[in-house]
Amino acid sequence: GLALGALHALSPPSALIAALVLFLLGVPHGAVERHPTEDGRLQRYRPTLRYTATYILLAALAFALWLATPLAMLALFLIASAIHFGESEPRLPLAGLWVVAGSLIVFTEPTLAIFEELSQTELSHFSTPARVLALTIGIALGVQAALRRDIAYAALLLGIFCLLDPVSAVALYYFAIHSLREWRETHAVRGTIDSMMKLYAPFSVPVFIGGAATITAAYLGWISTPTAAGFAIAIALPHMVPLERVLTRSRGPARPTKARTSAH
């Protein structure tokens, strides 16, 4: 976080590149199917053909909707992100809302400027309501942290989004907290790095390459920033909705096979 802050102060373009690298490094954490077990845990599996096809179909639909109505899709993505991040925070679910809105307290104009560029919609008149909303969420998060005796973690989250620029703050949370937590949980079950690589690689490698290519194309001016962002949002959105739960209900409980066993 300090490094990103220093980079932003000394060289904003370098800070942006560093943040994009963090986003890319966090991509593999979502490259698995996660099905709930009877005891409430999540089993991680290599994506099946059915899951992959459904994922790609939903991503294509999301990208088409982004091209048609970018503001509506941006709003949907932010809502889905808040829910997704909140579900990954067992002690402080309000952290999900904070990750999405926290930067609006200190960096109101820069955050809205990002939303404006992506949605191609004028949003400056929402600056006061946006700041009030973010402040309300921050207070609620502090109260929740006090009630659950998790003040230190809440203070860390508040600091990240009040001290770092919006892109760096989200990138740091996404990689260092959200993605690494997922990998730690998987490692606790899988036990070895080799086993984790076999689990994550089939889906994460092509997505990682595609993400790097998209960032490069946008940097070189081959595609617009809103188009690149829409592609990234379309790829991420199916991971944030309960896709695995829907597929599980439609086909019944998943039956572990030798290649898929991940719990002992």
Label every PLM stretch briefly.
Residues 1-5, 53-63, 79-85, 137-141, ...:
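Hydrophobic, membrane-inserted alpha-helices
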Residues 1-28, 232-233, 245, 249, ...:
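N-terminal signal-anchor module of multipass membrane proteins
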Residues 8-16, 63-74, 148, 161-170, ...:
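Transmembrane helix interruption/hinge and helix-loop junction motifs
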Residues 16-26, 70-83, 154-158, 169-181, ...:
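Hydrophobic core segments of alpha-helical transmembrane domains in multi-pass membrane proteins
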Residues 30-40, 79-92, 139-148, 180-190, ...:
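C-terminal ends of transmembrane helices
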Residues 39-50, 57-122:
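Membrane-interface helix-loop-helix junctions at boundaries between adjacent transmembrane segments
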Residues 83, 88-113, 124-146, 150-169, ...:
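Alpha-helical transmembrane segments of multi-pass integral membrane proteins
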Residues 160, 164, 172-201:
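Predominantly late transmembrane helices and immediately cytosolic-facing juxtamembrane segments
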